[in-house]
Amino acid sequence: MERLLIVNADDFGLSKGQNYGIIEACRNGIVTSTTALVNGQAIDHAVQLSRDEPSLAIGMHFVLTMGKPLTAMPGLTRDGVLGKWIWQLAEEDALPLEEITQELASQYLRFIELFGRKPTHLDSHHHVHMFPQIFPIVAKFAAEEGIALRIDRQPLSNDGDLPANLRSSQGFSSAFYGEEISEALFLQVLDDSSHRGERSLEVMCHPAFVDNTIRQSAYCFPRLTELDVLTSASLKYAIAERGYRLGSYHDV
């Protein structure tokens, strides 16, 4: 049985080093898809690079934890910027959901303005769209716009609550991450998905070249290791040998 594998590189637009890494992993590796931060400091550079790589499917990386929002968000920003205090607000059930709804729509329109088309799918920076308070907003929006959504089903209490016409992969894995990146780890992710009987799988990744922005990230040099693994010819062969076909959210 042929299975669909979506290898999605997060953080397109974060920095030039991140952008170049994603393009390299698409052109000479197994990355088939990426998600862009429309408020990223290098988003214009990402748009420019993407024009020369039409095979790269591009979705939107909804941002609520970094940089400046596109709309006024007094309930979520501090000194005009977004940050990781969103976790505290979520725990206190104090998220400004109306502001978040408006910001999602604004980032979506900005994506279309930048890339000239709809995103293939939605996900989010630091997985904030999986917060119980935010997920229904994003799921409803994706279904209404006819675009797919990254869904990590582990935090979900009931798949039956999803909109009937919402598209997603059957499986999602964030396990290809950390200090022990290797081909063996990537293939283990595939094998685990196969054992669960999933016919489609998205694997998240963050391939990049290190620049000054990436140096400031808590997740820095493993991004280079990811790039090495994702451009390995032997990995591409092993994926095909396991019955996986590389594709994107266009295929779900």
UniProtKB/Swiss-Prot annotation:
Gene3D superfamilies: Glycoside hydrolase/deacetylase (3.20.20.370). Its cofactor is Mg(2+). SUPFAM superfamilies: Glycoside hydrolase/deacetylase. InterPro entries: COD_ChbG_bac, Glyco_hydro/deAcase_b/a-brl, YdjC-like. Its EC number is 3.5.1.105. Signal peptide: none annotated. Homodimer. It comes from the Bacteria. Keywords: Carbohydrate metabolism, Chitin degradation, Cytoplasm, Hydrolase, Magnesium, Metal-binding, Polysaccharide degradation. This is Chitooligosaccharide deacetylase. Its main location: cytoplasm. The gene is chbG. It comes from Escherichia coli O6:H1 (strain CFT073 / ATCC 700928 / UPEC). Mg(2+) binds at residues 61, 125.
